[in-house]
Amino acid sequence: SFIASQCLAHGELTGFGAFHPDLTPAQAQQALDQIKELGLKGVKLHPDFQKFNIDDRKMYPFYEMIAGKLPVLFHTGDDRYDFSSPTRLARVLSDFPTLTAVAAHFGGYRRWDEAQAVLPKGQVYVDTCSSIAFIGVKRAQELIRHYGADHVLFGTDFPMWDAKDELAYLEEMDLTQEERDLIF
């Protein structure tokens, strides 16, 4: 409810609710109902912290429940683990073509090449958080053009990173005004 209250107080914010992967289907439905009642716009899953594989079959009932209804923001990438690999997300998207997925960190933190190779353009959205400082402005711009600015969302991973820094990276890019408008 904290996130929902902040979104109400600051209309420019879009909030997502959390979801625990070990919920029963009935509990999952109750959690989704609460997320909707709070006015939150989607669900955030962090497989590396929550210790589950994105493509684990135990998650399929949840994906069935949410497909076509709310987007799911997945933490993706990080080569220290395999829970959130872009390849795992690609399998899920193949099985659930109506699932609206946002793959954080340009599709895969520290696994950007893999993400670019396997994630289906046009079906997946990516965000810009916690990436540009590591891959550089030029590579980030290439990824924006690869996925299409209409499938890239501005993200900061605040409070981990300063939003001003994340904005500054995007300001350095050679993007059209239309691309900037789509990202923001």
Region annotations inferred by a language model:
Residues D33, H146-L153, M160-F184:
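Mid-to-C-terminal alpha-helical segments outside catalytic/metal-binding sites
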Residues S1-F74, D78-D79, F134:
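Active-site gating/metal-coordination segments in enzymes
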Residues S1, F83-T87, K164-L167:
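Short, surface-exposed alpha-helical segments at coil->helix boundaries
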Residues P47, S130, T156-F158:
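Short secondary-structure boundary segments
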Residues I3, I35, V43, I66, ...:
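Conserved, mostly hydrophobic/aromatic
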Residues A18, F49, S130, L170, ...:
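Short, flexible active-site loop motifs that bind/organize anionic cofactors or intermediates
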Residues K41-G42, F52-L153:
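Catalytic pocket-lining loop regions of alpha/beta-barrel enzymes
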